[in-house]
A protein has these predicted regions:
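Histidine-dependent nucleotide/RNA phosphoesterase domain, centered on the 2H-phosphoesterase fold
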Residues: 1-186
């Protein structure tokens, strides 16, 4: 099963992000936009795992989350991975407070014990809004995004994180919650 660990977004933030997607979509060429129920803040992409590892993984995540506090989150501004003419991913930025940095670091410390690998790049918290198809020219899209660089999508406090399964379907990926882990253990 294909899995990832994420912070779930409040409905108000999803609504604001969906409105931004609707504003940007007319400027986009060959972009697959995320639906509201697919929007999340990824902390760790695990990829394919055996179901037999879930109890051990859940135990480790419970341990990590129990030792950490809730995480203040602030989604604001738009950006992209790739270059201006040919972006690969369109995203909303999320600030990196110390609590989120500790959560991300603590998770990966445990995940490495299970053999998972991470990019050693700096963690760049973001919410993926859309993925551009190969060779799509989207200069007009990135120009339109320039007007929304400081747009606010919401502030909230993440009190838990979720282990999800990503199951492909003909209508796109379906994200299934496998387990929630309370931050602070309360």
């Amino acid at each position: 099963m294909r899995t990832f660990i994420a912070i779930t977004l409040p409905q108000e933030t999803k609504t604001a992000l969906t409105a931004a997607i609707k504003r940007l979509a007319p400027e986009a060429v060959d972009v697959t936009w995320c639906k509201a129920d697919q929007l999340h803040l990824t902390l760790a992409f695990l990829g394919e795992i055996a179901p037999s590892i879930l109890p051990h993984l859940s135990s480790a995540m419970t341990h990590v989350c129990g030792a950490l506090s809730a995480v203040p989150c602030h989604a604001h501004g738009l950006g992209f991975f790739g270059n201006r003419r040919n972006p690969k991913v369109i995203w909303a930025a999320v600030g990196l407070p110390p609590e989120m940095d500790r959560l991300h670091g603590g998770l990966w410390q445990e995940l490495k014990r299970f053999g998972f690998n991470t990019d050693e790049d700096r963690f760049r918290p973001h919410i993926t809004l859309g993925r551009c198809k190969e060779r799509a020219r989207n200069q007009a899209l990135t120009d339109a995004m320039d007007a929304d660089t400081e747009i606010e999508f919401g502030k909230w406090t993440a009190k838990d994180i979720t282990l999800y399964e990503s199951r492909p379907t003909p209508k796109g990926s379906l994200y299934i919650s496998l387990n929630k882990f309370r931050l602070g253990g309360r």
